[in-house]
Amino acid sequence: MPDRAQVIIRIVPGGGTKTLQQIINQLEYLSRKGKLELQRSARHLDIPVPPDQIRELAQSWVTEAGIYDESQSDDDRQQDLTTHIIVSFPAGTDQTAAYEASREWAAEMFGSGYGGGRYNYLTAYHVDRDHPHLHVVVNRRELLGHGWLKISRRHPQLNYDGLRKKMAEISLRHGIVLDATSRAERGIAERPITYAEHRRLERMQAQKIQFEDTDFDETSPEEDRRDLSQSFDPFRSDPSTGEPDRATRHDKQPLEQHARFQESAGSSIKADARIRVSLESERSAQPSASKIPVIGHFGIETSYVAEASVRKRSGIFGTSRPVTDVAMHTVKRQQRSKRRNDEEAGPSGANRKGLKAAQVDSEANVGEQDTRDDSNKAADPVSASIGTEQPEASPKRPRDRHDGELGGRKRARGNRRDDGRGGT
């Protein structure tokens, strides 16, 4: 007795929709952009849905869910609003019988309350393959309650075995004999192939067929056999002339270019080595090698910096001073040189202005002292002349006004005491 065909009911993984636009896209795909008919549930008298009413129908399903917030981002939505199921029949099954049996099965499972609730659903019947199949999209929100459709192994009615057995029972009434036994009952222990693996195998087979149909034969079979029989020799010569043939000359050109490249690379390494040796000898001859400027990639560098750059370019690494130390040493040396040049050149413009202001202040102090001690100066011209003399102002600190007054008074008292004209 031949084995009977098995019932195939597949819940599409990831086939549920979470947004309004996803529902619209799913229904448009199943209707092939309006070319196929979408039918409502038995509750709606199996009325077909026109293509221009798909958006309106999807909006009503979203409203029935009761949890859809238009302001919420699509990325934040986690609740599946629909479930996608495919009921397949064996190849060669009568298409009318398969359509009627699958529609009756959908009404029994989701529209009659068989599984504990009633749900809205749509169907699309496809015969584009050898085996006819029916797509069923179920609105997961109950019509008369607040529950959600859930198909699982633990559900008493809506489990995988229950779905297949009900499909075999209904199909038998329409003249389609199907087997709903499990794999274990049929003695099959290996893991079944998944739908993703099945689709991958289909794509690989299609690519293989396309590859075999492509014509890559551009040469004669005799030339192919001759080319395969000869081993590759880059220096093969033409037996008739004794000279390398045209293909051989073309093959030798890359080899010659490679040899010239290696020769130029070796000469570059030798040149870098010569530069490094000359720099080291120059550094040993000079007591301060850092004072020898060498033009580099970033301006004027010291010999140490140039040597470091040469070492880096030539791939030679030794125990020479780090470039950072040389740079810090150069900066400090420039600062000391600038400070020494400033001292030799004299005070700057700001310092000259400060000295001039100090001299003017000193002259004002002298004039005030002359006014206060005018009588003493008139009596003693020598003391007056001494009083008018002022020491040279220091460039670092100007004379204080009170210091000048006290010095003049002391000198005046000292002069009077020496002349015997007063003083205690």
Curated annotation (Swiss-Prot):
One function term, GO molecular function aspect: DNA endonuclease activity
An individual GO BP term: symbiont-mediated induction of tumor or growth in host
InterPro entries named among the record's database cross-references: Endonuclease_MobA/VirD2, VirD2
Basic residues compositional bias, start-end: 330-339
Top EC class, one word: hydrolase
A Pfam family assignment: Relaxase
Keywords: Crown gall tumor, Endonuclease, Hydrolase, Nuclease, Plasmid
EC number of this enzyme: 3.1.-.-
Bias kind Acidic residues: ranges: 212-221
Region ranges (Disordered): 206-269, 321-424
Protein name: T-DNA border endonuclease VirD2
Role according to the record: Tumor formation by A.tumefaciens involves the transfer and integration of a defined segment (T-DNA) of Ti plasmid DNA into the plant nuclear genome. The virD operon encodes a site-specific endonuclease that cleaves at a unique site within both 24 bp direct repeats flanking the T-DNA.
Compositional bias per record (Basic and acidic residues), positions renumbered to this chain: 243-261, 394-408, 415-424
UniProt key word Hydrolase: yes
Domain of life from the UniProt record: Bacteria
